[in-house]
Amino acid sequence: MIDREAPAAVLAPTPLLRHAIERACRRIAPVWPLKNFVAVNPFLGFSDRSFHATCAMLHRVARIDTLMPRAFYREAIRNGTIETADLAAALAAAPADWRLPTEAAELLKLADNDRIARKPPAVVATVAEVLNELAAGDRHVARTAFMTDEISRWCAAYFDEGQSVWRMPARGLRPYAAWRAWVRYDRNPEMMGIARFRALVADMPDDYVAAIATVIERLGIPARAVEDYLHQALLEIGGWAAYARYLMWNHELAGDRDDTLEQLLAIRVVWGYTLFAQRTDTAFREAWRRAMEQAALPPLDDQLGGDPDFCINMVLQEAYEIAFRRRLLDRLAGAPAARTAGARPAVQAAFCIDVRSEVYRRAMESVGDGVETVGFAGFFGFPIEFVPIGHVTGRAHCPVLLRPQFTVCEAVGGTSEEEDSEILVMRLLRRRVRKAWKSFKLSAVSSFIYVETAGLLFAGKILSDSLAVTRTVHDPNTDGLDDDLIGRLGPRIEPRPVGGRATGFDPAQRVAMAEAVLRAMSMTGPFARLVMLTGHGSTTVNNPHASGLDCGACGGHTGEANARVAAAILNDPDVRVALRQRGIDIPDDTVFLGCLHDTTTDVIRLFDIEQLPASHADDLRRLRALLAKATSLTRLERAALLGIARGAATEQQVVTRSRDWAQVRPEWGLAGNASFIAAPRARTRGIDLGGRSFLHDYDWQQDKDFGTLQLIMTAPMVVASWINLQYYGSTVNNAAFGAGNKVLHNVVGTLGVLEGNAGDLKVGLPWQSVHDGSRFVHEPLRLTVLIEAPLEAINGVIAKNDIVRELVDHHWLHLYAISPQGRVSHAYRGHLLWQQLEERSES
């Protein structure tokens, strides 16, 4: 018997309910598909709340921990990472209502115990959670897990982007309608003992909002708790909810609206209601009544004093971060004296601000006299859609915060239009043949015959793949092209219409972009004879998350196209004439080179060197020798973290890892990232920052209206914070914010991975990306940002941009200012207020 009587204080399908649905959906952070897996702040939906309140809320609503276990902090205290002064500073900064001891010694005593309070904080329960708590055996627990598995199975079929051989019927319908059409023939739930499942779903309204309202009413969710309940329901299918949030993000970026996530929410709450309808027994209904009474209590997310254990862990986390900032500021204070500017550099190399570039830049500067390196976002200020040969649409090579402004097509150099057409036709034909062959191998009948008859023919391929001699699959970037053509591929910047769209750059656009990029990099002279614009990518095999190791500023793709486009435009003689009229004089003998830094092997590839004049042959030879030395030094430094012993074969082992299909840690990615520094390179040159800092060159004295400062704080700084918080979340709670064990991953729908063969879509980073099997390689620290600019200018950017204000005022990062003398002089305290620091001290 189903209790259809609506209790008091519930919501009907009103604008208030629609608002609760929208807010619950916006609490979910998006996750990008595997083809362009970019780092995302898992707390993005809580940017309007403080870090502390968000941690409390997630613990209250979903019992999700966002801090490390207390044993982690105890170990940091024992090994000297956290000092007594750090604990004292954290206590002094803690709000008074946290009811903490005033002395560090007392805090140390409390930290020795894992828990001091008895009562856990209140939670907003879902039907699944109450069922799990009451389960006398495994059956009801299995039902709640079964619900997640069934929703995930349906989502995998509905959202599939070409992996499945058989397409799901009704994919043309919107999600809620498509799911109800699917359920009409799905007897799995009833076989699991969920009586009348299909009838219960059919009884729901056709409109998804009305269906949510019906469930809210029948469950008796208190009006105050509706948003929390809906949020908790989404968290139980958090991976697929995150993918639906990505679809919503993309539509909103284009000025449209998408309700996929809201419809997925309707599917989840209706599913939960079918479980509720099974239990009419007194024990369950009494437990549910108590849960709803608890949910009706007003939350106190901003008043943490009622949960002393949470407060202790939070202040220990603060002390842990203070300890890092103390060491960082001391290191920066010991920087060598800045060299006098003005002399022409021997070589200039612009790298992405990615923390992996810091190691290579330091190595490059140490092995060559007159080497000048620059840090800038890896898309080099060119927000392009790059369209490979044979594709109708392209890939966004820019931060996901932006939309591409230009379309650039890939082309084979030195060909006529007729040859281009032949190359295109041949590539499409080969890809179709491969697709047909794959379909044959995977078909229901031929798969068995194929394995029996042709399996041995692949023995050589399996052996060569296992020995890391060959790739396990064709490189999708060059699939279907002849080897002699691959080396001639490159972006075409000449303007021409393609498929009814304008592509390339006209003369005015080239000049405007060239000036903007050079000024944003603070690169206005003097210029070296060779200037490297170095994007980055990675080389791995059998790695579903491979794009996550590529350039985040390029939307999860390599920075090759952007670097080559920028170099081609800056080498344009007409552009240089126009730049001279705008105050940027690039010498005639300066040549820009598009380059690509492979962060797995630390090899730098130089493009279009055949276009170098003969006068630069010696320059090129010296550059290659310098890069070889820098590569060797960088590999040796990274080898220690990879667990590779130093020796004659060290460098070869680094390269071998990039081709090893069994390697779960081909490189460490951005593990360890902890700081972002926007200042002239002179402030950090010669300092070993351990590959943990995003380094963005910025000279505020060249930034007349502080437009570049605004660009840095609203784009690269925000992206760096996203990366930092993704690593933070995947470290403190990999089950909730990470992707689990990479060894167990199975790709689903080409969109993401499952851990095993069922369960929710995984988000975030695999465990192997933050842990080496015995210890954490990534330290869970919020980003420390240091900017050399006047306080008034920084405040101006904060005041004008909500996205920045929320980050700094709500403590999602720590902001510091560097004085014109190069000293870290002020700490941001919120609401446009700063505290002056004493020299070489931490607050």
UniProtKB/Swiss-Prot annotation:
Keywords: Cell inner membrane, Cell membrane, Membrane, Metal-binding, Transport, Zinc. Its cofactor is Zn(2+). Pfam families: DabA. It is found in: Cell inner membrane. GO terms for cellular component: plasma membrane. Forms a complex with DabB. PANTHER family: INORGANIC CARBON TRANSPORTER SUBUNIT DABA-RELATED, UPF0753 PROTEIN AQ_863. This is Probable inorganic carbon transporter subunit DabA 2. It comes from Bradyrhizobium sp. (strain BTAi1 / ATCC BAA-1182).
